[in-house]
């Protein structure tokens, strides 16, 4: 205990404050959200006509409405939501975990940092536990996550969706947004000649029509009003399934092991505030603590290895956990009476032929597309999509022609952002059983995010048409790197599929080229020219990272690896040699297989 107190005392003041908030929240010192927050938006009387109607009042729709009113204070904005507000806490929705872009959008762009710090949980990064034998010995599993940087300088949050959306609905009303709940969109007529669109609404058995210049579809994956009406849905080749529940129980993964070395890697109690991923071949299981005291527990799996039918109800879900993640299975089984809800979702990934139209409609959130929950990208897509929509509407209402902008934004959101993201996940679930390959892949995936779209969004350039067009060749280069590296990881896994790794941990915040040079510079305040130069430098850095990863796997692959840019092997290794810092720092990612370690010990 004295050692822990010393370590807490040595933390910077800001980190101690965050720790104090977490402790206060866990001990019940915080007053209830019902007593502290307004949770019912003001009543709104429907008008005959609006500038913008947003169909859907969930996370995407509410944040978009606030964003639009800030950008266009005179605009008449209506949000139509089919369900009743206030929503229950621990609302049964995906999107409880945010990462840098989404968190920055919520806390800084929209200005809700106070709510996120006081009413939600500050997240301690992403944390991964790779498989070892029957997965009962957590301390033996390879662990990837932050250890010493307990309070990361660029914040992210674990978000209780019900609590957050209740606050957003009230905030939208205060911004002048019209909000109606328990109201269904029963029809939509899209104008083709510049006249207003017509939205048909049904509320309490009464029907009403409203006209609008713009219509934004935030109605979600299942309803997807415009995507279904215009037959825009594209079936994704990424066919994974998910099931999850909320349980009124704070789950601390650290309590799954009493190993002193495992416990001593970081301050006691901090692991539970990470988004925790328990992984094995073909699946991962999430644990997400929520500020309301609940924990979200989910299974995401490739049906070729783990069919949805094996975990698609509570009993099967628990049985599946007993077999694959026994610590979680035991805990759920002992507390079945605390389960709050359960849902299973088949083939959650989906795509669209079009996101934005010169005909004054747009898709946002899950009504547009969704990739995969692994790295918590849902709020990122909301942030980027809302920003693009706000710029489109602002430009159009000012009289601008949207043809060029709509064409580029569709390419950016659909063909660049979605395509590069889906490749991270598609056909990659089997390699989650390979600790060596997945740790390298996770570093690559996170580095790619920090090096590309992260700094673009943080520097408020995502909707800057001139700037984004100027860096399109860089983006295409990033996209090509992504495609070929994901192919490489798959080949590497197939070549080393039988290896077992254990007794290792990696802290990505301790890799100098990655953390300070990429992550911390996402928000460096660059002007357009400096940011363009930084992105070009980041391409070069990622090439070197990819080259060194090829070098590390070279002996395992059945054929000579080619570099992402198509260089010969000799040119490839020469490129890697120019970044000796990358080589030295990535060396800590290479693990010794258990069989080799045992042989060395025997000798």
Segments (PLM) and residue ranges:
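Flexible, low-complexity inter-domain linkers and amphipathic docking helices that mediate domain-domain
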Residues: 1-37
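Beta1/beta-strand and adjacent pyrophosphate-binding region of the FAD-binding site
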Residues: 43-60, 78
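Conserved FAD-binding subdomain of flavin-dependent enzymes
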Residues: 67, 88, 92, 97-120, ...
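Glycine-rich FAD pyrophosphate-binding loop
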Residues: 69-94
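Predominantly flavin-linked oxidoreductase catalytic cores and closely associated redox partners
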Residues: 87, 171-328, 386
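A conserved beta-strand/loop capping segment in the N-terminal third of enzymes
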Residues: 108-158
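FAD/FMN-dependent oxidoreductases across multiple families
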Residues: 281-283, 289-293, 305-427, 431
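C-terminal helical "tail/cap" subdomain of flavin- and related membrane-associated enzymes
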Residues: 393-603
């Amino acid at each position: 205990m004295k050692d822990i107190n010393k370590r807490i005392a040595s933390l910077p003041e800001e980190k101690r404050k965050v720790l104090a908030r977490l402790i206060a929240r866990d001990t019940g010192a915080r007053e209830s959200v019902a007593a502290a927050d307004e949770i019912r938006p003001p009543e709104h009387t429907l008008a005959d006509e609006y500038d913008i109607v947003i169909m859907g009042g969930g996370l995407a729709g509410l944040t978009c409405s606030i964003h639009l009113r800030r950008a266009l204070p005179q605009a008449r904005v209506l949000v139509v939501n089919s369900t009743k507000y206030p929503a229950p806490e621990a609302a049964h929705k995906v999107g409880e975990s945010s990462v840098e872009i989404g968190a920055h959008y919520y806390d800084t762009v929209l200005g809700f940092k106070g709510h996120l710090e006081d009413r939600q949980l500050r997240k301690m990064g992403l944390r991964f536990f790779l498989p070892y034998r029957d997965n009962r010995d957590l301390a033996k599993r390879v662990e990837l996550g932050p250890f010493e940087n307990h309070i990361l300088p660029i914040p992210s949050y674990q978000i209780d969706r019900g609590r957050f959306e209740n606050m957003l609905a009230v905030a939208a009303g205060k911004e002048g947004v019209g909000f109606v709940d328990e109201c269904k969109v029963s029809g939509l007529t899209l104008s083709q000649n510049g006249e207003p669109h017509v939205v048909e609404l049904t509320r309490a058995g009464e029907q009403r029509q409203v006209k609008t210049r713009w219509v934004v579809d935030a109605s979600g994956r299942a309803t997807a009003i415009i995507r279904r009406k215009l037959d825009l849905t594209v079936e994704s080749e990424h066919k994974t399934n998910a099931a999850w529940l909320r349980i009124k129980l704070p789950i601390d993964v650290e309590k799954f092991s009493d190993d002193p070395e495992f416990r001593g890697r970081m301050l006691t109690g901090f692991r539970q505030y990470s988004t925790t991923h328990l992984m094995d071949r073909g699946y991962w299981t999430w644990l997400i603590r929520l500020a309301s005291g609940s924990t979200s527990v989910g299974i995401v799996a490739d049906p070729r290895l783990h069919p949805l039918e094996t975990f698609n109800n509570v009993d099967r879900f628990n049985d599946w956990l007993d077999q694959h993640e026994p610590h979680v299975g035991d805990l759920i089984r002992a507390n079945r009476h605390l389960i709050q809800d359960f849902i299973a979702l088949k083939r959650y990934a989906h795509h669209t032929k079009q996101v934005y139209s010169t005909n004054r409609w747009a898709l946002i959130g899950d009504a547009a597309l969704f990739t995969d929950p692994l790295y918590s990208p849902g709020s990122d897509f909301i942030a980027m999509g809302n920003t693009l929509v706000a710029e489109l509407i602002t430009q159009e209402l000012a009289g601008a022609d949207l043809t060029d902008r709509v064409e580029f934004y569709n390419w950016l959101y659909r063909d660049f952002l979605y395509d590069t993201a889906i490749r991270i996940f598609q056909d990659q679930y089997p390699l989650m059983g390979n600790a060596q390959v997945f740790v390298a892949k996770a570093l690559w995936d996170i580095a790619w995010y920090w090096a590309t779209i992260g700094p673009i969004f943080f520097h408020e350039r995502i909707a800057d048409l001139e700037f984004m067009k100027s860096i399109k060749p860089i983006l295409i280069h990033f996209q090509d790197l992504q495609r070929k590296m994901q192919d490489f990881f798959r080949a590497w896994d197939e070549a080393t599929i039988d290896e077992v790794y254990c007794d290792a941990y990696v802290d990505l915040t301790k890799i100098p080229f990655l953390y300070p040079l990429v992550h911390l510079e996402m928000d460096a305040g660059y002007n357009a020219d400096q940011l363009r130069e930084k992105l070009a430098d980041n391409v070069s850095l990622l090439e070197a990272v990819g080259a060194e990863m090829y070098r590390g796997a070279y002996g395992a692959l059945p054929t000579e690896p080619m570099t992402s840019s198509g260089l010969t092997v000799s040119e490839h290794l020469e490129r890697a040699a120019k970044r000796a810092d990358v080589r030295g720092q990535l060396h800590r990612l290479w693990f010794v297989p258990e069989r080799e370690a045992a042989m060395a010990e025997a000798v």
